Amino acid sequence: MERPGLVLQDLPPEILINIFSHLDEKDLFTLQELSTHFRNLIHDEELWKNLFKSRVHTTHFPTFSQSSKFSVEYIERTRGLHHWQHNKAIRTKYTIIPTRNWDQPSIERIVFDYPRVAAYNDGTITILQLQNHKRQKKFKKLIYIPCTTPQGCSTMDFNINAAVFGRFDGRVFGKLLSNKSYLTPVMEFTGRHSAGVTAICNSESWDTSREDWSVSGSENGEIIWWCENKLVKMWKVSNRVIWKLAFFKDWTLIMDDEKLYIIHQMQELHSIDIPKDLDEQPMRVRFFKMDFGSMTLVLADLNNVYTISVNPNGNFGNLRKLEMPEQICAVEIDEKTSQREQNWQFAGDDGCYISLLTTQNTLYIINIRDLSSSGLKVQCKISFDEQVYVSQVTNLIVVVALPNVLQILNAMTGELIKTVLKTEKFPEFLKVSQDKIIMGSGNVLNYLKFVSSDSKKHHHSTKGKNTVSNKWNETLNTELQYYDEDEDLRRKRQSEISRLIDAYGGDLELSGDTDEENDIQLRIALLESQEAQARNQAEAGEPVGDDEDEQLRRALEESQLIYETQTNSSANHGNNTNDEIDEDDEEFLRAIRQSRVEDERRRHLRNHTTGRRNGPLSDDNFATYGAAESSERTSTENTIGSSVGVDASNNVDEDLQLAIALSLSEIN
C-alpha cells in the first residue's frame, strides 16, 4: 500500500497540480495531511489557479475577496455561495403610502444602498431605514419627503443623495437628501440653459461626506456642472442634442447623436465617434452603462453590444463587439464594482460583470474587463422556461425575478444556488446590496435578509418566548394582506353607495345574498310585465279578465302573508320594532285594504257593464218612456263612472305594484 503513495509523490509537480485541480476543497485539505510534499503543492497558488480553469474555464473574473491569492479567492467565493445557498430568507413587507388617497402612486425608481432604501414616485421621495436604532425612542423606518415634480419637467435623475429635474425652458431644480435641506421645497438652481434640458444626472458617488454634484445637458449641446444648487461651470461641447450623461468624481461622459465626449476635471476634452451600423450610420443606442473602474463604456442596441475604452491614459478608443442571436431587452451592470477602480493585482484581474437579457428569456453573463480575447466573450448562458421580469448581477451571483419565484445563481457557472418562493407575481424592481435583496412592484417593497440557522437559534435563545417564528410572521403578513384587500373592497363599495345616494337619493346594497337579490329582481320584473300587459290591454279596449285580477289578488295575499310572517318572527326575537316601523306597517296595511276595496269596486263595475252590454234584452226594460229615459240616464252615469273608476284603478294599481315591489325588497 505504500508503493502507490511513493509513486504518486514521485510524479512531477505539474502533473500533480493538474490532478489535484480536479479535486474538491475538502479533499485537498485531507491530502495535505499525508505528506509535506503534498502540503507544499496544495499551498502553491498555481494549483488554485488551475482550479478556476477546470471549473469556470477562465482565470479572469471579478474579485470577491479583494486578494491577490487565488487560494483565498477560491475559498471566499465558496463560503459566499454557501451563505446564499444554506441561509434562510426572512422577508419583511413595506407598503409605501405617502398620501391618504385610495389610489396610491406606483414607485417609479428605487435605489438600494444598505441600510438605506430610497424610492421615488411622482410627488414623494420615501426613505426606508432597514437598521433599527434602539437608542432612538422615536425612530421611524419610513420617512416621506414631499418632492413635487416641477411643471414642464423634461428629464430627471434620482439617487440616494438627491433628486434633480430639468425643464423644457432650460431651468434646473433639485432637492437634496443628504442633510436637513430635504425639509425645504424643491429649489431652483442658480442658473439655466439657453435651451431645453435633455439629460441630467447626479454624481454616482454615494459618499455622503462629499458635496452633492450634478451635471445637465441641453438640446443645443450645453453642459453645466452644479455643486449643490450653484452653477460651477458651463461649457458648450457640441451643436447637437445631448442624449446621455454619466458623472463620477472627476470624470464626465457625454453622448450626442454622433460622438462621445470625455471630460476630466471639467477641463480636458476628448472625443470619439459612436460605433456605426451596417449602413454606416451611428448606431441607435438603447442601453448605456458606464464602468468607471476601468473607464469602459457599454453601448447596446437590439442586436449588438459594444464596449469602448474611454480612458485617455490607456487603450483609448478600443472597440469590441458581440452580436447577439436574440433581441436584447435589458442590460444590467455590477454597480459596486463599476464604481471601484480596477486593481490588476487582484486574483482574476478584478473583472466586472454585465448581464444581457433577451426576449427569449435567456441571460448572458459577460466580463467586460476581460482582455484575453479580441472580442467580447460570454462567461455563461442561462435559459429560463418562464418569463424573466428583472435581474441583477453582482461579482458573485445573479438574481433573477420570475413570477412568484426568485432564483439566485452562480454568476460564473450559471448554477442554481437557491430558490425563494412566494414572491411578487409581477416583479418590477430588484436590487442587491451586502447580501440583502429588495424587490417589489406597485407601491409594495419586500426586503429579504438571509440569516444562518445558528444565528437564528441564538436569536431564539436570547429572546425566548417573546420571539415570533418566521412562519408565524409570514402567516400574519398574509392575513394582513387579505385584510387590506377586504378593506379596500369595503371602501370601494361604500364609495359607490355614497355616489348613488348623492346622485339618485338611494343606494345599491352590494353585500347582500345573491339568490335573494335575483329573487327580488325576478319578482319586480314579473310585476312590471303584468303592469305593461294590463296597460296595453286597456289601451286596446280589451277587458282585463278575471285571471289578472286573481293574480293580483294572490300577489296581495302573498305580500301580506310574508309581512305577517316577518312581523311574527320579529316579535318572537324580542319585539324591538320602534314607532317609526309601526307607522310604516300600518300605512302599508291601509294601502292593502284600500287596494282591496278599489279592486272589488272595479270588478263590480266591470261585471255590471259587461252584463248590461252582453245580456239578453227584456221587455221590462222598455215598459214606459219614462222608465227608458231613466234607464238610459242611469246607464250613461254608470258608463262615465266606470271609465273614471278604471283610470283611477289603473293609477292605483301602478302605485300599488311599486309599493309591493319595494316592500318585497325590504322584507327580503
Curated annotation (Swiss-Prot):
**Species:** Saccharomyces cerevisiae (strain ATCC 204508 / S288c)
List Phosphoserine occurrences by residue.
Answer: S511
The F-box domain covers 5-51
Q: Which is one Gene Ontology cellular component term of this protein?
A: SCF ubiquitin ligase complex
Q: Which domain of life is it from?
A: Eukaryota
Name of the protein in question: Ubiquitin ligase complex F-box protein UFO1
Name the job this protein performs: Substrate recognition component of a SCF (SKP1-CUL1-F-box protein) E3 ubiquitin-protein ligase complex which mediates the ubiquitination and subsequent proteasomal degradation of target proteins. Probably recognizes and binds to phosphorylated target proteins.
Annotated CDD domains = F-box_ScUFO1-like
What Gene3D superfamilies does this protein map onto?
1.20.1280.50, YVTN repeat-like/Quinoprotein amine dehydrogenase (2.130.10.10)
Q: Which GO terms describe its molecular function?
A: protein-macromolecule adaptor activity
UniProt keywords (A-Z) are:
Phosphoprotein, Repeat, Ubl conjugation pathway
Gene that encodes the chain:
UFO1
Q: Where is the UIM domain?
A: 547-566, 583-602, 651-668
What are the Polar residues biased-composition ranges?
Answer: 564-578
Subunit comment for this entry? Interacts with SKP1. Component of the probable SCF(UFO1) complex containing CDC53, SKP1, RBX1 and UFO1.
Something else known: Present with 639 molecules/cell in log phase SD medium.
Any Pfam family matching the protein: F-box-like
The UniProt entry's GO biological process terms, in alphabetical order, are: cellular response to methylmercury; DNA damage response; protein ubiquitination; SCF-dependent proteasomal ubiquitin-dependent protein catabolic process; ubiquitin-dependent protein catabolic process
Pathway given for this chain reads:
Protein modification; protein ubiquitination
SMART domains listed in its UniProt record: FBOX, UIM
Question: Where is the region Disordered?
Answer: 564-585, 599-639
Q: Which residues form a coiled coil?
A: none
